[in-house]
UniProtKB/Swiss-Prot annotation:
InterPro entries: IspD, IspD/TarI, IspD/TarI_cytidylyltransf_bact, ISPD_synthase_CS, Nucleotide-diphossugar_trans. One of its GO terms (molecular function) is 2-C-methyl-D-erythritol 4-phosphate cytidylyltransferase activity. Keywords: Isoprene biosynthesis, Nucleotidyltransferase, Transferase. This is 2-C-methyl-D-erythritol 4-phosphate cytidylyltransferase. Pathway: Isoprenoid biosynthesis; isopentenyl diphosphate biosynthesis via DXP pathway; isopentenyl diphosphate from 1-deoxy-D-xylulose 5-phosphate: step 2/6. The record marks R15, K24 as: Transition state stabilizer. The gene is ispD. It comes from Chlorobium chlorochromatii (strain CaD3). It comes from the Bacteria. Its EC number is 2.7.7.60. The keyword Nucleotidyltransferase applies. It catalyses: 2-C-methyl-D-erythritol 4-phosphate + CTP + H(+) = 4-CDP-2-C-methyl-D-erythritol + diphosphate.
Length: 253
């Protein structure tokens, strides 16, 4: 399979409360930056042939240097992000289209991922890519742990309680057959219609397209607030311990 990854890493992380508009993707977990962990996972996924990353203009040299030092050979382009996340993804799609015209090769699927989700695993990337090609679209999600309620007509009071059994919390990478995602972004740009994730674009412009749910564990968190760093360090240690245990078991067998 020929899969392409788009990584959105343009956010300034207001909720992270970083000084001087710092970039949350450059925060360290386990001695390595968040974006390093993210890039490494896609580098190690066999189906991923090319990676496109959108970031702030001033961060482009830093990302390129990091990728070179970490041997991220699949990083095809680092492009300037847009005003909104959707604009950043669209900038990457346009770069993919340029490469397609030059090479004559269209990726089978495109996976769109948040740069601030450092714990996606290569085997999960592979499965999402496979399901995206099979069904046309696939989005990872987790079951909510908390009860979720609507806000009432008076915003200071609750409305109805939602059935938790019919709810999921959506994550990334979200995978789509290439033409589906490209056309959804083209139509959204033409209409000036914005959403917070790519699945919503497909739902709007291709309502007949079913989106496969890929249920995930709770490790694939998005680094958003200062508290997430503490949680991320614990997840990193757990993943490291599991990896070492797996390696030792394989050596003993």
């Amino acid at each position: 399979m020929n899969a392409t990854a788009i990584i959105a890493a343009s956010g300034i992380g207001k909720r992270m409360k970083l000084a001087n508009g710092g970039c949350k993707q450059m925060l360290e977990i386990g001695g390595f930056s968040v974006i390093y962990h993210t890039l490494k996972a896609f580098e190690q996924a066999p189906s991923i042939h090319n990676i496109y990353l959108a970031t702030r203009a001033e961060s482009i040299p830093l990302i390129q240097e990091l990728a070179a030092s970490a041997n991220i050979g699949k990083l095809t382009a680092v492009v300037e992000g847009g005003k909104e996340r959707q604009d950043s993804i669209n900038n990457c799609i346009k770069a993919i289209e340029v490469k397609r015209h030059q090479s004559g090769v269209t990726p089978d699927v495109i996976l769109v991922h948040d740069g601030a989700r450092p714990f996606i695993q290569p085997e999960e990337i592979e499965e999402i890519a496979r399901l995206s090609l099979l069904f046309g679209a696939c989005v990872p999600a987790t079951r909510p742990k908390d009860t979720i309620k609507f806000i009432g007509h008076d915003p200071e009071f609750f409305g109805e309680t939602l059935d938790r059994n019919r709810l999921v919390q959506v994550q990334t990478p979200q995978g789509f057959r290439s033409e589906l995602l490209m056309q959804a972004h083209q139509q959204a740009e033409a209409e000036g219609w914005y959403s917070t994730d790519d699945a919503a674009l497909v739902e709007r412009f291709f309502p007949q397209q079913l989106i496969k749910i890929f249920e995930m564990g709770y490790h694939n968190i998005k680094i958003t607030t200062p508290e997430d760093i503490l949680v991320a360090e614990a997840i990193y240690q757990q993943l490291q311990a599991h990896g070492n245990a797996t390696s030792e078991a394989a050596s003993a067998s």
